[in-house]
Amino acid sequence: MVHFTAEEKAAVTSLWSKMNVEEAGGEALGRLLVVYPWTQRFFDSFGNLSSPSAILGNPKVKAHGKKVLTSFGDAIKNMDNLKPAFAKLSELHCDKLHVDPENFKLLGNVMVIILATHFGKEFTPEVQAAWQKLVSAVAIALAHKYH
């Protein structure tokens, strides 16, 4: 289990409270699909993913990105208990969707980039360290059900 200090929790929640989940979620998932094109195979039903502009303008990408980022909100509420909080999502992604758990790490890294672009100087090294710790812990929690 990962332990978050009071300072780390404050750094994460402070930035999260200013986050536009819809905008940043679509941006994060879109960036994942552009930068790591092999991840597109999990989103066949999303329609046109033929170019970066098609991906970033795709309403299904934006909607699912919002859903993904909303789950990060759940992570923030359950920072001290991530594995149980993500048990159902882990099972879904493992047993039903067969997502390579390495993709969770990639998405976490993309999330950190999105945060840096959105928050600039507010995204200090200390804030980045707290967020990097969180996205890594979420990736581990999501990979928990994998064999």
Swiss-Prot record:
Domain called Globin: residue spans: 3-147
Keyword RNA-binding tagged: no
Disulfide bonds: none
Transport as UniProt keyword: yes
Function, in words: The epsilon chain is a beta-type chain of early mammalian embryonic hemoglobin.
Protein name: Hemoglobin subunit epsilon
Tissue spec: Red blood cells.
Source organism per UniProt: Homo sapiens (Human)
Organism phylogeny: Eukaryota, Metazoa, Chordata, Craniata, Vertebrata
Gene: HBE1
PROSITE patterns named among the record's database cross-references: GLOBIN
CDD domains in alphabetical order: Hb-beta-like
